[in-house]
Amino acid sequence: MQEWQALIARTHAAGLKVMMDFVPNHVAREYQSIAKPTGISDLGEKDDVSKHFSVQNNFYYCWGQPLNLENIAKHSSYIEQPAKATGNDCFHATPQKSDWYETIKLNYGIDYCDAGGRSEHFSPMPRTWMMMLDILLFWASKGIDAFRCDMAEMVPAAFWQYAMSEVKRLFPHVSFIGEVYNPSLYRLYIRSGFDYLYDKIGMYDCLRRVVRGECDATAITQVWQATDDIHTHMLYFLENHDEQRIAS
């Protein structure tokens, strides 16, 4: 931690800011903390694995079913009982190769498999909300300037509104950048408190088509106009770790 804080200090001394990647939707399937503070529980450590869904559980469980990886690796020796839902919302015990089978979905109080589908259970507050807020506050206290929030749209906006307001109350300088790919959700997540959102589906995809000669540059104007009311919250980019180099 001393090395980390020294890095932050050097970065700030150079006139730069430090942004940390925050992945709130999922964890690795073999996740476990290796340096957790005294008195802090791992995600899932106190779960009642006999329940598919509970607001007090951090994960979703396929009760009574072991994880079956036959579609991914024919002779896998990996054992998980009961199976946990994957990060891309696969709620059965036999994920496909196209699923995020190496990840586990975090439970923010939405029951995806009830009779009505996606019912919200936000009161009492889900345990995951409190644990993830603690993580944000911990790193904000170390001098982080911003969080880049991975797959933010897969986490309910209600959580973001709660968590970001709490972080900004104590650390008003901290900014939040959300990875939201669905343009119909842009305004919801901005209202929830995000300072900036990726404009991947809009501006990035448009610029890519222009560079490839698939459309005229006038298309850029149309993209701008589609988000004119929220353009100050849109983060435009040419490259990131998920996309090809723009020159290629």
Where are these regions (language model features)?
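Substrate-binding/active-site clefts of carbohydrate-active enzymes
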Residues: 1-4, 8-138, 169
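Short, solvent-exposed polar/charged micro-motifs at secondary-structure junctions
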Residues: 16, 186-189, 245-248
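Histidine-centered beta-alpha loop that forms part of the nucleotide-sugar donor binding/catalytic region
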Residues: 23, 181, 239
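General alpha-helical segment detector with a strong preference for membrane-spanning helices
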Residues: 25, 29, 183, 243-246
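Active-site-proximal helices and loops of the catalytic beta/alpha 8
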Residues: 26, 35-45, 50-68, 134-140, ...
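Active-site clefts of carbohydrate-active enzymes
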Residues: 102, 108, 228-248
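Glycine- and acidic
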Residues: 117-121, 144-149, 243-247
